[in-house]
Amino acid sequence: MSETDIVTFVNLCGFTEPLFMDMEHVKKASVFGRRAAPGALTFALAEGLIMQTGLIHGTGMAYLGGEMRIIAPVLEGDTLRVEVEVVDKRETKKPDRGIVTYAHRVLNQRDELVLEARIQRMIRRKTA
């Protein structure tokens, strides 16, 4: 997670919180002593890492939502990885698609859990 990643994201999304934007504030008020990443950025990067695996390439139809918990801060300089597990799948009324539930675990370079999520997606099915 680079400073550029954080600054670009907070400017793009309008995250005006001094914790993300103002290094003088960070130096004075943050318990971390360096810039923290918004949880939304951590989630977005995790989704990008998953997309890069090709796991759902060409099959994704819709992101249906889910639940996310921020467990620990992600700070400038951290390196992230994602573990993904299919925890449920079900057919829909339409034979060309199904609903898949994934559990995501985002870990930093010290293998500390920083974010966990349970996500549902509509996925294209192979037809017989």
Which positions does each model-derived feature cover?
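Hot-dog-fold acyl-thioester-processing enzymes
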Residues: 1-65, 128
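HotDog/MaoC-like acyl-thioester-processing domains
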Residues: 70-128
